[in-house]
Amino acid sequence: CGLTALGFTPGQNLAIVGDNRPHLYLMFLATQSLRGVPVPMYQDAVATEMAFVLRDAEVHFALAEDQEQVDKLLELRAATGEQAVPGLTHIIYDDPRGMRNYRQPGLISVDELMALGRAHEREHPQLFADLVAQGQPDDVAVILYTSGTTGRPKGVCQTHAAFVASARGGVETDGLKAGDDVLSYLPPAWVGDFLFS
């Protein structure tokens, strides 16, 4: 519940940008468990491409894989005019390499976030279980943005029920069984990767 300790509330959106990494997928689950909505973005997007999604989804929290992604987010947070994303108040980063001298407000490592979460859980031991229990199949599970090739990208809201049904169909079609391994190598922002991850 480190996110909750930072002020993240049910219904809020959390942007996630980076390559396939365990902490990024754990943040998907943490966000959903707190009844929030992950908004994955393509790791190769330039800052200007990210600005629209961050504003459109009204993102206040973002998880960045590394310094490259943090730099893009900080650039947008400091920008003025059309590229500005002033609502982005918290940036969490996974890979600490290159981050030693970064001291911007609202910037925190995954390790620091997890320490906050442990402390918050001691004070509110039932909160996580209560939020998970309140989740519903028709709650939005993720917002996936289209590529924007025919105009501005569009946020597609997918429910938990829709993803469970699609996952079942994929498992049946591919003949997957318990114990089979699936390698996730596509960008987390693509629906196919999200489905099998």
Language-model-detected regions and their locations in the chain:
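Conserved short alpha-helical elements in the N-terminal third of ANL/AMP-binding
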Residues: 30-36, 189-197
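Conserved structural elements of the adenylate-forming
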Residues: 1, 156-177, 195
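Conserved AMP-binding/adenylate-forming
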Residues: 2-47
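Structural core segment of the AMP-binding/adenylate-forming
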Residues: 5-6, 34-116
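Conserved pre-ATP/AMP-binding loop-to-beta segment of ANL
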Residues: 107-145, 152, 175-181
